[in-house]
């Protein structure tokens, strides 16, 4: 399917509000060199993510529903490892937080979607691999342990061609 946005879903043992708080503490799990600059936890906040001179993107927090949802709009991007360097500009990054089974206390599902990151674009392979690492390892560990234990600065390097 050429129009399918990249999605990753994880299940964590912490309650929805803890997951929400961890997602909004972006600099702790979306690592880079130098990483995240700016505020990330209030509606209207704008922040920049950088990884060396390979990736630059500016995000604006456009939706925050405590314990339920976080949405960022990518307002600017420069991906130096692909031909269309602005491929992310205008895309949206969404985290939907839910309790998939109300009988199981403290189980939370997080559905990550990068709206606009679809198989037909040049960045899809590298970017979906990087997002998979960030969501399945870095964010999951940060939610579970309060710190990022899996994804080092080198982790991105293997996902994005230099």
Map each language-model feature to its residues:
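Intrinsic-disorder/low-complexity, polar/charged segments enriched in Ser/Thr/Lys/Arg/Asp/Glu/Gln
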Residues: 3-9, 46, 56, 69, ...
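Hydrophobic pocket/interface hotspot
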Residues: 19-23, 47, 61, 72, ...
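Hydrophobic/aromatic beta-strand elements that line small-molecule binding cavities or substrate pockets
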Residues: 8-10, 58-63, 91-101
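Glycine-rich portal/gate segments that line the openings of hydrophobic small-molecule binding cavities
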Residues: 28, 34-84
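Hydrophobic ligand-binding cavity/cleft-lining segments
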Residues: 1-38
């Amino acid at each position: 399917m050429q129009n399918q946005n990249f999605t990753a879903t994880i299940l964590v043992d912490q309650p929805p509000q803890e997951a929400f708080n961890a997602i909004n503490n972006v600099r702790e799990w979306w690592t880079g060199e130098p990483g995240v600059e700016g505020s990330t936890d209030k509606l209207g906040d704008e922040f920049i993510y950088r990884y060396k001179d390979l990736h630059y993107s500016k995000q604006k927090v456009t939706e925050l529903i405590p314990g339920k949802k976080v949405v960022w709009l990518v307002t600017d991007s420069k991906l130096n490892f692909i031909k269309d360097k602005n491929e992310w500009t205008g895309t949206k990054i969404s985290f939907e937080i839910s309790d998939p089974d109300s009988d199981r206390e403290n189980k939370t599902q997080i559905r990550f979607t990068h709206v606009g990151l679809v198989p037909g674009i040049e960045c899809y392979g590298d970017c979906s691999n990087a997002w998979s690492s960030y969501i399945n390892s870095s964010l999951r560990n940060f939610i579970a342990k309060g710190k990022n234990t899996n994804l080092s600065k080198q982790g991105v390097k293997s996902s994005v061609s230099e």
